[in-house]
Amino acid sequence: MNFILIPYLCKNLTIMTREETVLNYLREHNIPFTNYNHPEGKTIEEARRWWKDDGSVHCKNLFFRNHKGNKHYLVCFDCDHDLAIHDLEARLKESLISKGLPSCGKLSFASPERMMRYLGLEPGSVSPFGLINDTEHHVHLFLDENLRNASSLSFHPNDCRGTVVISHDDFERYLKEVGNTYEYITLY
């Protein structure tokens, strides 16, 4: 299936790229960040070539759906770690059930269509900044507990040709502004 990407419109009706949408959102909410552009890096392996040695924890972001397809989860963790989906399912279930919420059930990667519908993104550009597009707050964000210890984090600005570096405290401010539910859990 082919997608027709429709550029975002900002308040003054000018066309903005996905990256500009993220950067403008952060500026409008007075959230400090640094940004740099580089050649396309759709995978961690590709992007590593272009990342600067800025001291940030570069994050891997995976988008899942439950077996019924009615719940969606974005999972973020340090890109230097790997996760088996079965282990991830167990940890997410444990976290949800401990809060009295229904289990996530069996997880699978969300399709590109679902990614576009809920985050406005394509594979290779997923990041927590996609939550800007989730105006109904459908997606729940799981962050690895170890990210709390990072002084700064880095993510794609919804475009795999750039990197945004943001302090952990300012990332927390972003999450409160965007309004989706989120929690920290131990993933590894």
Model-derived regions, located:
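Extended, low-hydrophobicity, polar/charged segments
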Residues: 3-188
